[in-house]
Amino acid sequence: MQVLVRDNNVDQALKALKKKMQREGIFREMKLRGHYEKPSEKKAREKAEAVRRARKLARKKLQREGLLPMKPKPVFGAGPGGDRRGPGAGPGAGPRPAR
């Protein structure tokens, strides 16, 4: 697997490499091959994964048809460490004081 390093920017190249590896499923493969998996365990795991995929597919289909409510979209700006001052946000839940 090759990644182009532009302007000696190794951090960006590493990020691109990790993204490629993630897409290819290399990390998942490494995790699975980290220890021996008995054939019966492998069969059970693959069956569970297939059931999970089928359930997810059925849920998506029902959502598209309008029979199930859609998953709420995340509100941007209130992520980790962000400003979450809403109802019941604790003492002094008003606007943030200026610095």
UniProtKB/Swiss-Prot annotation:
<dbReference type="GO" id="GO:1990904">
    <property type="term" value="C:ribonucleoprotein complex"/>
</dbReference>
<dbReference type="InterPro" id="IPR038380">
    <property type="entry name" value="Ribosomal_bS21_sf"/>
</dbReference>
<comment type="similarity">
    <text>Belongs to the bacterial ribosomal protein bS21 family.</text>
</comment>
<keyword id="KW-0687">Ribonucleoprotein</keyword>
<protein>
    <recommendedName>
        <fullName>Small ribosomal subunit protein bS21</fullName>
    </recommendedName>
</protein>
<keyword id="KW-0689">Ribosomal protein</keyword>
<dbReference type="InterPro" id="IPR001911">
    <property type="entry name" value="Ribosomal_bS21"/>
</dbReference>
<feature type="region of interest" description="Disordered">
    <location>
        <begin position="60"/>
        <end position="99"/>
    </location>
</feature>
<dbReference type="GO" id="GO:0003735">
    <property type="term" value="F:structural constituent of ribosome"/>
</dbReference>
<dbReference type="Pfam" id="PF01165">
    <property type="entry name" value="Ribosomal_S21"/>
</dbReference>
<dbReference type="GO" id="GO:0005840">
    <property type="term" value="C:ribosome"/>
</dbReference>
<dbReference type="InterPro" id="IPR018278">
    <property type="entry name" value="Ribosomal_bS21_CS"/>
</dbReference>
<dbReference type="GO" id="GO:0006412">
    <property type="term" value="P:translation"/>
</dbReference>
